[in-house]
From Swiss-Prot:
Pathway entry: Protein modification; lipoprotein biosynthesis (diacylglyceryl transfer)
Organism of origin: Rickettsia rickettsii (strain Sheila Smith)
InterPro entries named among the record's database cross-references: Lgt
Annotated function: Catalyzes the transfer of the diacylglyceryl group from phosphatidylglycerol to the sulfhydryl group of the N-terminal cysteine of a prolipoprotein, the first step in the formation of mature lipoproteins.
Name of this protein: Phosphatidylglycerol--prolipoprotein diacylglyceryl transferase
UniProt record, GO biological process: lipoprotein biosynthetic process
Length: 259
């Protein structure tokens, strides 16, 4: 299959370029805010709409700073230590979900500490929202022709312009489907059908567990980052970073259902 050559830049005004990647962040945050408000309206949890509105600034800073620093420190430290100014070039791409997640968690902790809010009550509201951003972000990765999969002989293998012109798994679409659509559906079903907000930490545990499982599995089809390659002969950085998420998620699920 031929890659649909879509310009990563939607439009430019002088030096200002609006990319699909940056737009995915903006739309993801807006849709997430809207969806979280709907959850609050229906279930009336400890978290209020005013709390959510106040948290947005914390979340944006935590996600962007954490995502960027995560990529810099975990995926390409030599380049950025040699050229520190490149750290600011976020328009070139280069964000780590695991770094963004950690940044968001730290931001949530600081926010909850300041406003004396239960930490897991906040993350349980945020958990069902995150797959929206994951879906849009992976679609943007696909449009950019980055983070593509390993070489395949399958009929749906796709030739990406930035690769070696060999057919590859469109792993960005696999991630958009499982980490985005499927995970969103699981959490929506849990939240609205099984009223999981009544059990503190359960939504957060479901998110971490299923994200970890999906990411570890899909990494089998994704090409390792060229500057890192395989770790311990067969593991990728994404798989290694997802194991703690899987363990944390399992713990949160267990502690939310004490015997």
């Amino acid at each position: 299959m031929t890659f649909p050559n879509i310009n990563p830049v939607i439009f430019s005004i002088g030096p200002l370029a609006i990319s699909w990647y940056s737009l995915s962040y903006v739309i993801g945050i807006l849709l997430g805010w809207f969806y979280a408000n709907k959850i609050i309206e229906k279930f009336k949890p400890q978290i209020t709409k005013k709390n959510l509105e106040d948290f947005i600034t914390y979340a944006v800073i935590g996600i962007i700073v954490g995502g960027r620093l995560g990529f810099v420190l975990l995926y390409n430290p030599s380049r950025y230590f040699s050229n520190p100014i490149d750290i600011l070039k976020t328009y070139e791409g280069g964000m780590s979900f695991h770094g963004g997640a950690l940044g968001g968690i730290i931001a949530a902790y600081l926010f909850c500490r300041k406003y004396k809010i239960n930490f897991l009550s906040l993350t349980d509201i945020i958990a069902p929202v995150v797959p929206i951003g994951l879906f849009l972000g992976r679609i943007a990765n696909f449009i950019n022709g980055e983070l593509y999969g390993r070489i395949t002989n399958a009929s749906f293998g796709m030739i990406f312009p930035n690769s070696d012109l060999m057919p590859r798994h469109p792993s960005q679409l696999y991630e958009a489907f499982f980490e985005g659509l499927v995970l969103f559906s699981i959490l929506a079903y849990a939240t609205f059908k099984h009223k999981t907000l009544k059990k503190c930490g359960l939504n957060s545990g479901i998110f971490f567990t299923f994200y970890g499982l999906f990411r570890i599995t899909i990494e089998i089809f994704r090409e390792p980052d060229i500057q890192i390659g395989f770790i311990l002969d067969s593991l990728t950085m994404g798989q290694i970073l997802s194991v703690p998420m899987l363990l944390l998620g399992s713990y949160l699920i267990c502690q939310s259902n004490p015997k």
